[in-house]
Amino acid sequence: FLPLLLAGLPKLLCLFFKKC
């Protein structure tokens, strides 16, 4: 579960700040 959360966080930040 934790690895999934850590993998999903960068994607969420990418969407919010639009810096992919």
From Swiss-Prot:
The keyword Iron is annotated on this UniProt entry: no
Entry comment describing in which tissues the protein is expressed: Expressed by the skin glands.
GO cellular component terms listed in the entry, alphabetical order: extracellular region
Cystines in this chain: 14-20
Coiled-coil zones: none
Compartmental location: Secreted
Alphabetic keyword roster: Amphibian defense peptide, Antibiotic, Antimicrobial, Cytolysis, Disulfide bond, Hemolysis, Secreted
Biological processes, Gene Ontology terms: defense response to bacterium; killing of cells of another organism
Family: Belongs to the frog skin active peptide (FSAP) family. Brevinin subfamily.
Listed name of the protein: Brevinin-1DYc
Species in which this protein is naturally found: Rana dybowskii (Dybovsky's frog)
